[in-house]
Amino acid sequence: MKKRVEKDAAYICTTPFQLMSAVTLAVSNGETADVFIDPQFRENEKYIKRLRKTGVFERVTDLGRDTGAVRARNVKNKYLRGLRIKLIHLNIKGAFRKSLGGHRYKKLYTSNNSYFFDLMMRYFLAVDARPQVVFFDDGEGSYDNPKCRIPNKKYVSKDSVTVKYLYSPELYLKMNGRNNREDIRPLPLMDHDKRVRKAIDLIFDTKKIPVVGEPLMILDTMRETCMDEKTAKDYSETLFKVCEKIGKNNVCIKQHPRDKSDTWKGYNIYPDSSVPFELLCMTSDVDKKVIITLSSTAVMMPKILFGKEPVIILLYKLFKMKIADDGGRDKIYKQLRNIYQNKKRVLIPETQEELFSYLDELGKRRGR
């Protein structure tokens, strides 16, 4: 029988962003903590190996090695998938004996009600151990997605207060208002502490990340997922005109990681589309740049993670998308503008003329 081990906390991470946030919070809180990685991102084994070297967490567990749970989730037939997951629920102690056997935690940090969060909480309840559920920042979803903001009622007591660590409590409160059932706490800026920066540099090998030298960045999108063919053509032509106006050599294109098209052949394409934008914010002088995007919420990151204020130009009002906006885009970007010290640096043109007028004005400022 395994000896019981009690620790302050454990973190569940599914994305590189969550991993960076977990490192930031673990160092800030100074707790004795473990981390469990649900490896759904590229090169996860490399990141996990480097994470162990940082010493931030006492124990780093790759949940991908819990092959039964991973295989069940990956079954394509939804009925068979549901059956396989149900069988794991029925044998939850056996399913997680290897990863969790003997371990108890005062707190379980998660960014959302994820698959492995649900399974781990089922395990803890089965062995009569109920950790306090604490949410930590997952980017845009933590501010406007209920799945990332509201804990599953099965795992919190009826009258409990949900603790949430966020990079921008100000933005959260502007988006959602105050709630006496929530305890919103600030998560320090990602590079506030040398230990955090050193750990992130090691995990992601930031010295090898190409620096963006161009003054303008375009965060491109997967056109076929959000536009019809005609709109996609109009969108591309607009961006080509932007590049022509600014000068091709002054523009860096960051393609979507899944975009294999040759749309930008002959332009300055960022050499590794899989590099998280958050890391570019850390390694490049992003506050001195102009960033253009259709509606990528990645543009929130310079401000909320690092306190930097690049010029942001959002184009979503110029093009009709397949999924109609329910007002959510306007809400989050207008509130992002409200937390900028210089609100004129968040631009949302409603016409082509307005877009190119913005670019003319920015060109005049740079020429001074």
Feature annotation, model-predicted:
Residues F41-K49, F117-L119, S142-N145, T225-M227, ...:
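Short, charged/polar "capping" segments at the starts of alpha-helices
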Residues A22, F277-D325:
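A donor-sugar binding/catalytic signature common to diverse glycosyltransferases
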Residues F240-S274:
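Catalytic donor nucleotide-activated moiety binding site of glycosyltransferases and closely related
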Residues D62-V70, S111-S114, V133-E140, G213-E224, ...:
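Short loop/turn segments at strand-loop or loop-helix junctions that form parts
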Residues A324-R368:
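Leloir-type glycosyltransferase catalytic cores
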Residues A10-D159, V299:
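Active-site and donor-binding regions of nucleotide-sugar-utilizing enzymes
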Residues V5-K46, P215-T221, K230-C252:
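N-terminal beta-strand-loop-alpha-helix module at the start
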Residues F136-L219:
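A nucleotide-sugar donor-handling region in carbohydrate enzymes
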